[in-house]
From Swiss-Prot:
This is Uncharacterized lipoprotein MCAP_0231. Pfam families: Mycop_pep_DUF31. It comes from Mycoplasma capricolum subsp. capricolum (strain California kid / ATCC 27343 / NCTC 10154). The lineage of its organism: Bacteria, Bacillati, Mycoplasmatota, Mollicutes, Mycoplasmataceae. A lipid is attached at C24 (S-diacylglycerol cysteine). InterPro entries: Mycoplasma_peptidase_DUF31, Uncharacterised_MG067.
């Protein structure tokens, strides 16, 4: 009986098991169907990628969003309806390119996708579509701003025909550590003479800024040197023109009138204003011989003269250097900054790339909480007007000094700087022949730069395209925050056994500049975006920069003048590797040249000729709109306060 009962009980389970089995099979079919539907959501990758071709991370973002989404709460019917819609969109996009659609068509498609995804509560995917909508609106805004800018400057843009310009083709040329035979025609100048001249012309510089709220700020030091001067008539007074890096003048704000600041595009929207100048120098430096690398000597420390007593009070707790007020120095003013110095025609092909890079950088900083009170002003200014000027790291400021009102020490500094520039010009004048310099065109500067010489088919035997030795000296900041006089080219630079650069021969055979260059405005358009100059957003850099060996002067030396071995000034020191330590001089750095004498085609773009010091020859520098000399003409239309129109470099700033 028990066995029967067991049997019956088993038989009684059969219908139940059958029902359960059927239910599981049905559930499995539903799950498989849902999984297939979910997999079809990956059509979104193709669709959304069509709207943002440049976003390499979009595919992985969509996949992650799909994996995170809870599809179990969505009915198969709703999934099927959405997938049918996505399939239709995908098929349409496969038959036409996204470029055939106008902005409204694109927004319409994205909005419908967003509505479908929103109805399924797929929030992660909705957010991705939202990002694309915002990007699309930004791109359209950039294009419209670009069109407005072109229309506004139509005359400026259309007045030049590239077909009438001589244009050089850039090409890859390996580093060259040798000179052509005709180099023997040029006479070199001793290292000691060059370093002495650099010392005389060079100063450590710092500035005092009055903040909009009434506070004061002095932020770091740099290096500057005497580019030019004007001697006032019947007096012992001079106007000194000091060249340095634009980044050294990052807080050098609103020194001109409001109208001039806007005219030159030098305004700082923060409302801050530079009011103080600290002019520094290491006294009694007489030894200009080479030193061992990593010597880290702090014997030649700069002390400073200040133009106002507020600056002296501000620095009263600075125990590392002497800071002394002198009533003979005026308030400094900017004369030229190499920002927005090319006509719009020269950069019109870069405009969209610049806007895109700036917006990407802004979004990166915003997402990483790197927007602070200072750069917020810069980004608000950019977002309001979409202006992003291209710059080179070069600037000139001026101050007046009355030698009758200064002490003996400062008087000797100024007199020696003036003598240093005079000696430089006298030596060039007496040289029978100089490389890359037609003295009929310029008495003070090369007329053909190294890069143009490299790409030219020039058989004149007048031009060099590399430099065996380059001399740079300035005031890097030591680990104790002291500005110390220091020269490049340590003793190891001439070692016949040491190789400091793995791509080069031994140091004694390595050229300081072996035609290794960098550019940002040609192939790739990979500009660097900065938000810390004058509370503005700028892009670097126009033209070329030279990579220089044995010249890794530490921070604070920014702005130093660079000579070649023939005693010609060729550029300004502006960048060094971030891992360099104070005193290590064997690494590489960069200088920005003062000119590019020829138009050079790089990829699909042309980098047009410019001369930062004198761009007045518009047969040569057609696309340039400002330079040091041109700004002098605008700042002093009637000459200087004594009525004269001459400087040491220019007999007449107008002719």
């Amino acid at each position: 009986m028990k066995r029967t009962i067991k049997y019956l009980s088993f038989l009684g389970l059969i219908p139940f098991l059958s029902i359960t089995t059927i239910s599981c099979v049905k559930q499995a079919k539903e799950n498989n169907n849902k999984n297939q539907l979910i997999s079809q959501f990956k059509q979104l990758i193709f669709i959304l990628n069509s709207f943002d071709l440049d976003n390499k991370k979009l595919e992985s973002k969509i996949i992650k969003a799909i994996e995170k989404s809870d599809f179990n709460k969505i009915s198969n019917i709703n999934l099927e309806l959405t997938i049918k819609f996505l399939t239709r969109i995908k098929n349409e996009l496969e038959t036409k390119t996204i470029s055939q659609l106008n902005k409204n068509d694109k927004l319409d498609i994205l909005t419908k996708i967003k509505v479908h995804l929103g109805s399924l509560n797929l929030i992660e995917l909705v957010n991705i579509v939202d990002e694309l909508v915002n990007k699309l609106n930004q791109k359209e805004e950039i294009k419209n701003t670009h069109k407005d800018k072109i229309e506004k400057n139509k005359d400026n843009i259309e007045d030049i025909d590239d077909s009438k310009l001589e244009i050089l083709e850039s090409k890859y040329i390996p580093n060259q550590h040798n000179y052509p035979d005709y180099v023997k025609n040029f006479k070199t100048v001793s290292a000691e003479e060059i370093y002495k001249e650099l010392y005389d012309r060079t100063f450590s510089i710092k500035f005092l800024v009055k903040l909009k709220d009434g506070g004061l700020l002095s932020n770091g030091t740099g290096t500057g040197w005497l580019l030019d001067y004007h001697k006032y008539s019947n007096t012992n007074k001079y106007k000194m023109f000091i060249a340095t890096n634009l980044h050294v003048l990052a807080d050098f704000s609103n020194s001109l009138t409001d109208e001039q600041n806007k005219e030159f595009n030098y305004y700082d929207p923060s409302g801050n204003k530079v009011i103080g100048l600290g002019l520094g120098k290491a006294d009694n430096v007489t030894d200009f011989s080479r030193k061992n690398n990593n010597s880290k000597s702090e014997n030649n420390i700069a002390n400073y003269y200040l133009n106002n007593q507020d600056f002296e009070n501000y620095l009263k707790n600075d125990f590392w250097s002497v800071n002394k007020f002198s009533k003979g120095i005026s308030e400094p003013k900017i004369v030229f900054g190499a920002v927005d110095f090319m006509k719009d025609r020269a950069i019109k092909n870069h405009y969209e790339a610049l806007q895109k890079e700036a917006i990407n950088y802004y979004n990166y900083k915003k997402n990483n909480n790197e927007i602070n009170d200072d750069n917020k002003i810069a980004w608000n200014n950019f977002l309001n007007n979409k202006d992003i000027p291209i710059m080179i790291d070069f600037a000139v400021f001026e101050f007046d000094v009355d030698l009758d009102l200064v002490d003996y020490n400062l008087k000797s500094w100024i007199s020696n700087a003036i003598s240093g520039l005079d000696n430089y010009l006298d030596r060039l004048n007496k040289a029978p022949i100089l490389p890359n310099q037609d003295k009929k065109i310029s008495k003070y500067l090369q007329t053909t730069d190294y890069v143009s010489a490299l790409f030219k088919k020039d058989k004149s035997e007048q031009n060099l395209y590399n430099a065996k030795d380059i001399y740079i000296a300035g005031y890097p900041t030591s680990q104790y925050s002291r500005s110390v006089w220091m020269q490049n080219n340590p003793i190891e630079r001439n070692s016949s056994t040491l190789t400091s650069n793995w791509r080069s021969p031994t140091n004694d055979k390595t050229f300081a500049f072996a035609n290794e260059v960098e550019e940002k405005a040609g192939t790739g358009l990979n500009f660097n975006i900065h938000d810390n100059y004058w509370h503005r957003v700028f892009a670097t850099f126009y033209g070329y920069q030279y990579n220089i060996n044995f010249s890794s002067l530490y921070y604070g030396a920014s702005g130093s003048l660079a000579y070649n071995e023939f005693g010609q000034m060729i550029g300004i020191y502006n960048n060094v590797k971030s891992n360099v330590e104070f005193g290590d001089l064997l690494q590489s750095a960069t200088i920005a040249p003062f000119l590019q004498s020829d138009n050079i085609k790089v990829g699909d773009n042309i980098i047009y000729a410019y001369n930062l010091i004198d761009g007045t020859d518009k047969t040569k520098y057609k696309y340039q709109k400002s330079s040091f000399r041109e700004n002098l003409q605008k700042l002093y239309p009637n000459g200087f306060s004594d009525g004269l129109k001459s400087t040491k470099l220019f007999d007449d700033i107008f002719n």
